[in-house]
Amino acid sequence: MKSLAGHVVKYGKHRERKSFARISEVLELPNLIEIQTDSYQWFLDEGLREMFEDILPIDDFNGNLSLEFVDYELKEPKYTVAEARAHDANYSAPLHVTLRLTNRETGEIKAQEVFFGDFPLMTEQGTFIINGAERVIVSQLVRSPGVYFHGKVDKNGKEGFGSTVIPNRGAWLEMETDAKDISYVRIDRTRKIPLTVLVRALGFGSDDTIFEIFGDSETLRNTVEKDLHKNASDSRTEEGLKDVYERLRPGEPKTADSSRNLLNARFFDPKRYDLANVGRYKVNKKLDLKTRLLNLTLAETLVDPETGEIIVEKGTVLTHQVMETLAPFIDNGLNSVTYYPSEDGVVTDPMTVQVIKVFSPKDPEREVNVIGNGYPESAVKTVRPADIIASMSYFLNLMEGIGNVDDIDHLGNRRIRSVGELLQNQFRIGLARMERVVRERMSIQDTETLTPQQLINIRPVVASIKEFFGSSQLSQFMDQTNPLGELTHKRRLSALGPGGLTRDRAGYEVRDVHYSHYGRMCPIETPEGPNIGLINSLSSYAKVNKFGFIETPYRRVDRETGRVTDQIDYLTADIEDHYIVAQANSPLNEDGTFAQDVVMARAQSENLEVSIDKVDYMDVSPKQVVAVATACIPFLENDDSNRALMGANMQRQAVPLINPQAPWVGTGMEYKSAHDSGAALLCKHDGVVEFVDASEIRVRRDNGALDKYAVTKFRRSNSGTSYNQRPIVHLGEKVEKGDTLADGPSMEQGEMALGQNVLVGFMTWEGYNYEDAIIMSRRLVKDDVYTSIHIEEYESEARDTKLGPEEITREIPNVGEDALKDLDEMGIIRIGAEVQDGDLLVGKVTPKGVTELSAEERLLHAIFGEKAREVRDTSLRVPHGGGGIVHDVKIFTREAGDELSPGVNMLVRVYIVQKRKIHEGDKMAGRHGNKGVVSRIMPEEDMPFLPDGTPIDIMLNPLGVPSRMNIGQVLELHLGMAARQLGIHVATPVFDGASDEDVWETVREAGMASDAKTILYDGRTGEPFDGRVSVGVMYMIKLAHMVDDKLHARSIGPYSLVTQQPLGGKAQFGGQRFGEMEVWALEAYGAAYTLQEILTYKSDDVVGRVKTYEAIVKGEPIPKPGVPESFRVLVKELQSLGLDMRVLDIKDSEIELRDMDDEDDDLITVDALTKFAEQQTAKELEKKAAEQVEDERQDIIQNFETAEDNLD
């Protein structure tokens, strides 16, 4: 194959990279969010209709009225996406359903369109807007319905088998053997009953029939012996039915009729039992005779029923070739046998199965019946007697060594429930609840005047949809830290959630990597911690088929010519098991044949060297194994998988920076991942850019129409980062459909740009980079290299209270004029104001309760309009660490037509923007799991510098590399340096990237030293360091764990109600817990006073802390502490147990523990002091007012006297 190392590849219109890939891409990556969009589209097109057709028609109890489904339609949405965001509304469209009500008595038919509630719509980005917030519905990975067989070992070490028929919804049917070789069944986890009892209940009551169907076997004989109703020829169906009923409903009177009804309802009623399409497909596939008979020896001659010709002789071994001949005959019902159940059985229809006799592998003399279920059509969604009999046959065959047990962790047995199906299931619940209401209304209301509208109550349907989007475990607030986080969230697969696993019950096997994950689920990207292995990510090329199984693409190998064709087949895991697949990097000749006679290939869980004539398929790309985030790690093949996992996860936490920079060393995935993430602004039609500015782009289509694109500016993302788009097209540029018009956050020239390319040296420096710490140059702070913008939202509601409405106002009690300087006349902060912690954002007062006014107060009120009623200041203030610049203010009122919650009259939202430079304590990381905390930011002049005088930007500890085995970072460092010297961007795709030779060759080309190291000089002394140092360009990202969000100090804050100790945590403005061990430390030091005040004043001595406050205010010595509140709580607890507890001092005299309410009246509390201050202020105001009144009175008297004098 021709060497492609170092060819130039174009990514989008604006970026070229030198790619080191040797394998040419045969298949484009699919649209990365199609798992969301396609599934939802299926729901709108087919899923909804399926639902209505399942539940309707609804007949009343007499069969007179019937409500039928005609059609449905989604009308225009009420709000656009942007309006829904702004109004805190849902982005949804009204669903209207046309229903027909038929009265069979009168023959009257009424058709009517009924409103079925607003249905949330998916945005183009694959998200939903619920209450103004973007949410993602995560796809769920669940066990597929079907029939499963497993081996089990009992406590004595005896091997046995078990089997389970799992429906999509309905009762489970389990089979198992015990130590005595007797087979039992359990229905829906109840007590076990002998297998033959269920067969009798189905209508095959006599022993002869049972042996005729299943053939003779030791297990069956033991089971019949155990069966209480054994009788060779008489049918014992009725006894079987009663037996089953007794096990299912112990204690109730057993009759054959009630048992018949119960079994019918459990298994054969489509409303209660549903295998779904996928369940029927899996059952037919598992019970398929073609796979079960493979490599067995026939015990009968098979004859074509139509012509009488012999197809296969008795004694023939059924190899692949023989089975190919036999397959069409089996499909056409070869050896079908019809059994007629007795009239008193559960089933009355005849049962047709296919029975083929083979010799037992364990005893070649004995014949064994292998029974197939006769392939029911996919429309049959319930389990049928033929399925039960065929699965029992499979179960009995397993003991003869025929058939295989299933691996439940294999992806052939696990399927994806995407948005569409999850919504459909939820909608079904709502419709089923509605159905009950409709039936009741049909029987109550007057049939003459009845219309479909009167029958339908949409409340249960609306509620179930609302519940799903609002509170389901799978409906998640979208991770919007950066576009990669957004994309990964939409491609996430969770094994948790309703109908899935729980964290506590999930063992190692479920979480582990399985060979069937290859090309379907990423083996690397999964969270660390309790969810490891339960939350996964879809591989880059994987798709989900109509049954919900994950498929991965392979190139077909033409067996005859040995050529690898460009024909792509998408295979599910269970189908892939039958083939041998070569790796994507197997060398090929010009004509597409393999260049070597032997290639590395996979056959199920084995990695083998296989001769090329046995190969069926070949991988399409080396990156089909991994997920998108993992495929963004260059030199992934040189990293340990644990570190790669951290690298993949940490890229999702990268904070968007002010000036994003795409990596010099990329993998070629940067463009595709940014393009499909939903953060970029994409062109919808071919055309020419006619107008472009920061807020709008207009494209004139080729057909003359004009498309307008709004560019989002500085919107708050779900994660509090800035969501900002920047146009990258220019006036007059020709654009095509799908081109990137504007970069989103963390994007540059259409590529994902999560961090910055910085000059990194691997060296220690005065111990400041001990334990993965990072030393950084002040240049990165000064030039805003790692500066990010954060927008926080604060809101204040004015509600109706019992004492009157709250008011948003500028007039706030006891607040000086300087605190109100940035508030407008309504009391709301102005846009652009710079605010600090504790500043007012929205002035608000709440009524305290109206007291009777005295005569003076009434006079005051009459003169000055002073507020007579007492109000409390409940203004919105900037919380600790929330200072910044007011970016936007939104006001919602009922008058303006905004929908507000009940009891809310006005809602004000204030957005504060912060510009955060990088800081000591911030967390940073590379792409290889090499994370650390910034420990010191040094002046540029003190940083070590290169021989040409360039100071380096970051120093990393070289000890972070060997034990962690993420060597990829060192290769990235060297290649990055070479790329920067050459002025080119490079791409090194995963598992097909630059080899060591490529790296060294590029290093030589760039004119660097052969070891890629350099001498560094100490910035303080100018002396060279002893050894040569690896210096290069590495891509480093700033993570969302910023010290500004974590730093916290308490001054005076809230106390817990019962123990009166300070609360904990930053959110509660709490204190630091001084625990048991910390107390020991102070005891060890003998720091008695410190210890005393920590256990009393600073904790829960309520009286003491108030007196201490008072003493500090008055400048007096601090008094002795009292009894801590937690001690009183203990005493009260013991008293509540009926123990007479008393507290004595050293002199044995009793200390009186008074309740807090009984404290001396002269005890001053903080509240009391505040109230005292308020009263003083009020008195001052009163005094001033009185003086003013007196002055005015004197003025009036003076004026009178003057007037009198003038008259005289």
UniProtKB/Swiss-Prot annotation:
Protein task: DNA-dependent RNA polymerase catalyzes the transcription of DNA into RNA using the four ribonucleoside triphosphates as substrates.
Keyword Aminoacyl-tRNA synthetase listed: no
Reactions catalysed, as given in the entry: RNA(n) + a ribonucleoside 5'-triphosphate = RNA(n+1) + diphosphate
Single GO term (MF): DNA binding
PROSITE patterns membership: RNA_POL_BETA (PS01166)
A GO term from the CC aspect: DNA-directed RNA polymerase complex
Species name: Enterococcus faecium (Streptococcus faecium)
EC number(s) on file: 2.7.7.6
Protein name: DNA-directed RNA polymerase subunit beta
